[in-house]
C-alpha cells in the first residue's frame, strides 16, 4: 500500500515538471492564491491554526491531523469513562500483546488481543463510543496511558496489533526486532496470508523510539499492521457489536500463526515451555 502511494506521488511530481508554468491565466490564479494566503496568515485567529498545521506537516512525529487528543490525559479529561475500556493481563515478562487502538478505532484488533490474552500478557485500549470511536485514537508515539507504560516496563518483547485502511487482504510487519519480524512474516505467508516485512524507516514500521510498543524493558518490538479487508475476513459480522462471537476460521488461523510464533521464538528460545 505504501509503495503504491509513493508511486502515485512520483507520477504527480513528474507531471508537474512537464507542465507549462507560463501564461496569463496561471499568473492570475497564482496571484489570487497568494492574496488569499496573505489574508489568512494576517488573521489573528487563523495564524495559530496555520502554524500548528505547518508544524504537523513537517514534523512526522507530531500529532496526526486525525487525532483529537495529543495524549491520554487530554482524552481522560474530556471523555466519559464509559466511552472507552482498558484490559490488562500479566502472565509473565517474556511477551506483551499490545492493542492501543481497539474497539471501534481499528476494528478487529480488540478481538485478536483478547484471544491472545488467554495465554499471554496483554494490554488493550478500546474505543467504545458510537459514533465517534475514531476520535479516541491517540497515535502510538503519543500514547501514554499509565497502565500501558507500567505493564510495558515489566516485559521484554512487545507484539503490537494495529489496523490500516486497505481493500487488500494484507499484513505489514514492522518493529525494532528485525529478526523476529522477519520470522513472523514468513510464518504468515507460509500459512497462506499475504504479508510483507517493512523497511525500518517505513511510516508504519513502528521503529520510532517514542512508539509505545518500544517502551518495554528492552526496546524490542514487532508491529503488525493488518489491513481492513484482512480484518473483515476474520469475522462473519464486522461491526463493533457484531464481531464478538462471530470470529471464523480465518480469525483462528491467524491466531494460530501468532501463537506458533510466540511459542517457538519466545518461549522455546528461552528454554521455557509455553
UniProtKB/Swiss-Prot annotation:
InterPro entries: Gamma_PGA_hydro, Gamma_PGA_hydro_sf
Database matches in Pfam families: Gamma_PGA_hydro (PF05908)
Molecular function via GO: hydrolase activity
Domain of life: Bacteria
Family membership noted in the UniProt record: Belongs to the UPF0714 family.
Name under which the protein is recorded: SPbeta prophage-derived UPF0714 protein YoqZ
Gene transcribed to yield this protein: yoqZ
